[in-house]
């Protein structure tokens, strides 16, 4: 990592390695996860895989005479930033030794089970504390370090580095020989030992996933309803990892940190794609309004990451981040905004048996009117903020498209006569005669304000009721009328919004 960058966030999670004979039929390997500015690194960590690791395995010696933990090489080589969130009682849950007067750095000599430091799964006996909330402790005395740690609030950011050469000194520290500043836990939280699972095919070397427009999603599994799983995929779809955290809070914290780092790349990605989009010269290649990953709920019950790119007129979908003009010009699916509507908080029967559950409160449906009917797709996002942003952008995009297009025409038949129906956002509905060789004649004109109801038969017929003498007129559009129905609704919605803004 280049000098000058902040220390990465690190912690121990579990990596799914493949099928096995244990619970859930899956094999898991304990790994060290390191979140840097531009990449997520998964490194091998020693220890048997299991659904709930013991604190002693994660944080160092917990019994008198126990040996210090065997830590992954990647952890020995780097400075790390660890955020500790203290409970109302119990403090950080560490003891320290060393100090300038002892010609030693400030070292963690003991970690109490169940307290805040232990729960991070990212601090170890033998870690040197380099700073506390940005305050340098590299030359602090023991008392200065104690005071710096005591005056912290509920959230403490420690910068640490593991000191392999001094960790044997604390081999028997759990027996009570350490001099600590934190009160020992009154009633330490106990965790039940986990039965080791079958030996997986271990990760043999570090795996790096670029964070540039990467996809990250919190998940459940059919055998574990707690959303403590993370799926992370590189933007090109080539590198992917499926991780298990100790609980939902840990998974949420990691997902938030990873998403925040990914978010720093979005302005650059938008600029790159904007240049490619402009170079394609295709219709609708205006400014990019929004870009991001959605999780599509497939009809089979599974899910798939889908990259959505919103322009002024279209919503484009890709399986991976386009890297060329050719890739950008070939989306897997395109939805014209003027014929698309969105809805969320749907009432549904839930995912099918064996599928990955998802949060219906963070889901929304996209419905697009086409010549073959209504094309419906269900997506989910990771946070209420994402849902609000996509919903707002889609509604605004629909209105922008309506205001930009202004008018749409289609061939039809009315009372047996070939006609052309024009729908204009300001002028309303106009029927023109379209007999071969005949002069263009206006047969009917009605403003939007006169429209009392519209409906269709889902096959070819469009019904427009203007009241008055004409009543309901029936138009045969010779194909599924859903596209025109959605466009009429978009014009109406844009007009209502316009009136609301002017009121």
UniProtKB/Swiss-Prot annotation:
The keyword Ligase does not apply. GO terms for molecular function: actin binding; calmodulin binding; structural molecule activity; transmembrane transporter binding. Disulfide bonds: none annotated. GO terms for biological process: neuromuscular junction development; regulation of vasoconstriction by circulating norepinephrine. High expression in skeletal muscle. Expressed at intermediate level in heart, kidney and brain, and at low level in intestine, liver, lung and testis. InterPro entries: PDZ, PDZ_sf, PH-like_dom_sf, PH_domain, PHsplit_syntrophin, Syntrophin, Syntrophin_4th. Residues 81-164 form the PDZ domain. The modification Phosphoserine is found at residues 95, 178, 183, 187, 194. Pfam families: PDZ (PF00595), PH (PF00169), PH_17 (PF18012), Syntrophin_4th (PF23012). Residues 447-503 form the SU domain. Residues 6-263, 287-399 form the PH domain. GO terms for cellular component: anchoring junction; cytoplasm; cytoskeleton; postsynaptic membrane; protein-containing complex; sarcolemma. Keywords: Actin-binding, Calcium, Calmodulin-binding, Cell junction, Cell membrane, Cytoplasm, Cytoskeleton, Membrane, Phosphoprotein, Repeat. Its main location: membrane. Adapter protein that binds to and probably organizes the subcellular localization of a variety of membrane proteins. May link various receptors to the actin cytoskeleton and the extracellular matrix via the dystrophin glycoprotein complex. Plays an important role in synapse formation and in the organization of UTRN and acetylcholine receptors at the neuromuscular synapse. Binds to phosphatidylinositol 4,5-bisphosphate. Belongs to the syntrophin family. The PH 1 domain mediates the oligomerization in a calcium dependent manner, and the association with the phosphatidylinositol 4,5-bisphosphate. The PDZ domain binds to the last three or four amino acids of ion channels and receptor proteins. The association with dystrophin or related proteins probably leaves the PDZ domain available to recruit proteins to the membrane. Monomer and homodimer. Interacts with MAPK12, TGFA, GA and F-actin. Interacts with the other members of the syntrophin family: SNTB1 and SNTB2; with dystrophin protein DMD and related proteins DTNA and UTRN; SGCG and SGCA of the dystrophin glycoprotein complex; NOS1; GRB2; calmodulin and the sodium channel proteins SCN4A and SCN5A. Interacts with MYOC; regulates muscle hypertrophy. Interacts with DTNB. PANTHER family: ALPHA-1-SYNTROPHIN, SYNTROPHIN. This is Alpha-1-syntrophin. The lineage of its organism: Eukaryota, Metazoa, Chordata, Craniata, Vertebrata. The gene is Snta1.
């Amino acid at each position: 990592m280049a000098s000058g960058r902040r220390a990465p966030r690190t912690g121990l999670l579990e990596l799914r390695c493949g099928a096995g004979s244990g619970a859930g039929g899956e094999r898991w390997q304990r790994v060290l996860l390191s979140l840097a500015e531009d990449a997520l690194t998964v490194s091998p960590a020693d220890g048997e895989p299991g659904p709930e690791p013991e604190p002693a395995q994660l944080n160092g010696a917990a019994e008198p005479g126990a040996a210090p933990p065997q830590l992954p090489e990647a952890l020995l080589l780097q400075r790390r930033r660890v955020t500790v969130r203290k409970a109302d009682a119990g403090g950080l849950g560490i003891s320290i030794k060393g100090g300038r007067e002892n010609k030693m750095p400030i070292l963690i000599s003991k970690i109490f089970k169940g307290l805040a430091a232990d729960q991070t799964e990212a601090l170890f006996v033998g870690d040197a504390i380099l700073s506390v909330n940005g305050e340098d402790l590299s030359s602090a005395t023991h008392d200065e370090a104690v005071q710096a740690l005591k005056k912290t609030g509920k959230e403490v950011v420690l910068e640490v580095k593991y000191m392999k050469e001094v960790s044997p000194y604390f081999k028997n520290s759990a027996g009570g020989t350490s001099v600590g500043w934190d009160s020992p836990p009154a009633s330490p939280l106990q965790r039940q030992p986990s039965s080791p699972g079958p030996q997986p095919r271990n990760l043999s070397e570090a795996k790096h996933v670029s964070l540039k427009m990467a996809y990250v999603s919190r998940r459940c599994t059919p055998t574990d309803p707690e959303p403590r799983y993370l799926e992370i995929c590189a933007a090109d779809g080539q590198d992917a990892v499926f991780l298990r955290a100790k609980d939902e809070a840990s998974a949420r914290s990691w997902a938030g940190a990873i998403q925040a780092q990914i978010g720093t790349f979005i302005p650059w990605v938008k600029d790159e794609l904007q240049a490619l989009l402009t170079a394609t010269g295709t219709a609708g290649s205006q400014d990019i309004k929004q870009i991001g990953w959605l999780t599509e709920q497939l009809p089979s019950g599974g899910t798939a990451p889908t990259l959505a790119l919103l322009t002024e007129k279209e919503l484009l979908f890709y399986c991976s981040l386009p890297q060329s003009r050719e890739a950008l010009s070939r989306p897997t699916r395109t939805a014209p905004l003027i014929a698309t509507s969105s809805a969320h908080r749907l009432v549904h029967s839930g995912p099918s048996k064996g599928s990955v559950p998802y949060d219906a409160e963070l889901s929304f449906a996209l419905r697009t009117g086409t010549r073959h009917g209504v094309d419906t797709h269900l997506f989910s996002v990771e946070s209420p903020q994402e849902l609000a942003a996509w919903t707002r952008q889609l509604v605004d995009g629909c209105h922008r498209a309506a205001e930009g297009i202004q008018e749409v025409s289609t061939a039809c038949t009315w009372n047996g006569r070939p006609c052309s129906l024009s729908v204009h956002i300001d002028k309303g509905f106009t029927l023109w005669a379209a007999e071969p060789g005949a002069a263009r004649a206006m047969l009917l004109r009605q403003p939007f304000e006169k429209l009392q109801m519209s409906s269709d038969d889902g096959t070819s017929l469009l019904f427009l009721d203007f009241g008055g003498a004409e009543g309901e007129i029936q138009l045969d559009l010779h194909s599924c009328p859903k596209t025109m129905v959605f466009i009429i609704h978009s014009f109406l919605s844009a007009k209502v919004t316009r009136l609301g803004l002017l009121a």
